[in-house]
Amino acid sequence: MAIILNEMLKKSFITALLLLIFSVLRAQDGTSAFQFLKLPFSAHASALGGENISIIEDDLTMAVQNPALLSCVADKTLNLNYMLYMDGVNVGGAAFARTAGERSTWAITAQYVDYGELKETTEENIETGTFSAKDISISGIYTYDLSDYWSGGVRTNFIYSHYDKYSSFAIGVDLGLNYYHQESDFSASLVARNLGGQLKAFEERHEKLPVDVQLGFSKRLSHAPFRLSLTLHDLTHWSASTTAANNFGKKLLNHIALGIDFLPTNNFYLAAGYNFRRGEDMKINGSSHWAGFTCGTGIQLKRLKLGM
């Protein structure tokens, strides 16, 4: 009886997620607020081209990328992270996870972005003073193992932004699905991020959240210490780019992030990646695409895990 119920639950979750994603793909257009939600919470994901939803490891930050990956996280895991994103912009966060029975895991997370003191100017570029700006998000994550191969997760995110005298509050939901075949070490994930909307707008006009549908794959090679990853991201905005991409091939590349891990042991990794969208958008005056490259490393020492 339990097997039948689990199979029905798995099929219902997958069907509901696919229907929701298809409806989102048809409805999305225009700009959105809360762009800080696109920042990677995970140092490992940042190193793999800035986008990854499919690597399987005991890393709580990956559950923010894909809530279904929370099933890989050990009980009573605590995570603290900090990143100097740009000059004067500080990004930090914390997360804690607990298992709940054999198939369920829950977690709470918090993230902030502090932009420091910004100059306030008139339309004539005359400086009139300074103001502060910050973004904050607090979320809860729940994941359930639908079977030995499938897991599904949901993340509810409470979002607050304050810029000078303007503020806004929103609620977003992330839905994630992961398939993992342990014998072949192959993982595939589907995620719909930032579904929801503003409850309080900055001014009179309500803005959308930066909805992002992603599809990702990771595969560890059988006879070599490497894991390859491919992530298709921002599928809700097929033509989105600051540069013109008129053919299908260029548009497709602008939605691809590639990553590779070197895994000599279970406690250490070297990671590198390339984000085609970032490389295309950040090149200046015909310069190279090196801006799309990323890299990082991580090490686990007993109960402490470090990533950068």
What are these model-predicted stretches?
Residues 1-5, 23, 60, 188:
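Generic secretory/membrane-interface signal
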Residues 18-26:
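Hydrophobic h-region of N-terminal signal peptides that target proteins for export
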Residues 7, 26-28:
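Extreme N-terminus of proteins, especially the signal/transit-peptide cleavage junction
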Residues 28-308:
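Subset of outer-membrane beta-barrel
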Residues 1-11, 148:
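Positively charged n-region of N-terminal signal peptides that target proteins for export
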Residues 10-18:
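Sec-dependent signal peptide recognition
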